[in-house]
């Protein structure tokens, strides 16, 4: 089944690409979610008429993500947690804890945007945490974990 993508989809394509996908993936996921339309002649013509509008929306999303990244790059967060004598935490600091700390600091961040490639943080210290705001925009936040 051929579809025209209405937004960027990881490992598939970007806005306006005509791609071939399995029929079930197109019918049951891409089209109902509004991420693609079937590649008929009528839909192709309609997409070309809306292309400028869709590209403008995508550029606005990118610019707002870049503005948020500029704010986040200047932020240092301090999280207090119970820890043992050697700095090992009783528990861990995960994506939700970091997102909540950033939200309390006045910057709205969803926990899905926080990237912890090595898993939850289990020691006191300073950590550079990546915040993925857009597929092209990543911000770095310095998180300091101190014991109570």
Curated annotation (Swiss-Prot):
UniProt keyword Lyase, yes or no: no
InterPro entries linked to this entry: Ribosomal_bL9, Ribosomal_bL9/RNase_H1_N, Ribosomal_bL9_bac/chp, Ribosomal_bL9_C, Ribosomal_bL9_C_sf, Ribosomal_bL9_N, Ribosomal_bL9_N_sf
Example of a GO MF term: structural constituent of ribosome
Annotated TM spans: none
Pfam entry (one): Ribosomal_L9_C
PROSITE patterns listed in its UniProt record: RIBOSOMAL_L9
Protein name: Large ribosomal subunit protein bL9
Biological classification of the source: Bacteria, Pseudomonadati, Pseudomonadota, Gammaproteobacteria, Moraxellales
Gene it is expressed from: rplI
